[in-house]
Swiss-Prot record:
Keywords (A to Z) from UniProt: Amino-acid biosynthesis, Cytoplasm, Diaminopimelate biosynthesis, Lyase, Lysine biosynthesis, Schiff base
Similarity comment text for this entry: Belongs to the DapA family.
Species, as recorded: Streptococcus sanguinis (strain SK36)
Protein name: 4-hydroxy-tetrahydrodipicolinate synthase
Pathway annotation: Amino-acid biosynthesis; L-lysine biosynthesis via DAP pathway; (S)-tetrahydrodipicolinate from L-aspartate: step 3/4
Gene3D superfamilies listed in its UniProt record: Aldolase class I (3.20.20.70)
InterPro entries: Aldolase_TIM, DapA, DapA-like, Schiff_base-form_aldolases_AS
Amino acid sequence: MAYADLKNCKIITAFITPFHEDGSINFEAIPDLIEHLLAHHTDGILLAGTTAESPTLTHDEELELFAAVQKVVKGRVPLIAGVGTNETRDSIEFVKEVDEFGGFAAGLAIVPYYNKPSQEGMYQHFKAIADASNLPIIIYNIPGRVVVEMTPETMLRLAEHPNIIGVKECTSLANMAYLIEHRPEEFLIYTGEDGDAFHAMNLGADGVISVASHTNGDEMFEMLDAIEHNDIKKAAAIQRKFIPKVNALFSYPSPAPVKAVLNYLGFAAGPTRLPLVPAPEEDAKRIIKVVVDGDYQATKETVKGVLRPDY
């Protein structure tokens, strides 16, 4: 059922966590943010991922966040819960808790960070999580954050597990092409790189788990819709204008830029939690001009070339 729920999700938004100035979660801001996303082509929502600043959230806070979002969404789109840590036992305990909590199509588990496990260690980590829970698991492969990279061969070994249903892939397009070519049936492949969505979808990926969909969901939808209708020329034209906006959204450690834009648009995204800090005021103004207005003079002042940042 989880595969069927997610198969038609082209744009899954990696939801921010709105905070008050004192650092507490701003639950009152969640309804407006969710309705904004759903009005602008979000097909699914990931909670407690990187963009949510999950390393700064306690498990209790994550469960409170889950309850608040479920109350607003009311089953209109599938939800994915961030469940993974760099400690296998903790990941198993939390994925069981989230499974019992209910209301999620899948759990997203990150490749363990800091520990620097081998490929066999990664395999055993995800196998243990998937064995322990009924909640389907999506692997999150993001070497820029965790230092180690799961190889396509290890990924395909794990793809044979009946409870591992997909991957959020943030490596190379070459790796993505290999995975798409060799994946088993009913294994979902999402890019986690907004700037790669055009290429990934043309290669045959299932969708994108996105930060930019908070602010530019309509553009992303138009691009993916053009690809689906084989209008590559139109999709490429949208992509060329979209890339500078993505670059601006990642010109400071995420989610600081997207929160700056959302705050400007009138959504109470609030600040980031330490150790992340907001983008400096003048840079935030330029980011807003790029993302909201497509101001390419601001683009030149904000980012140089195509960014592939580690954040």
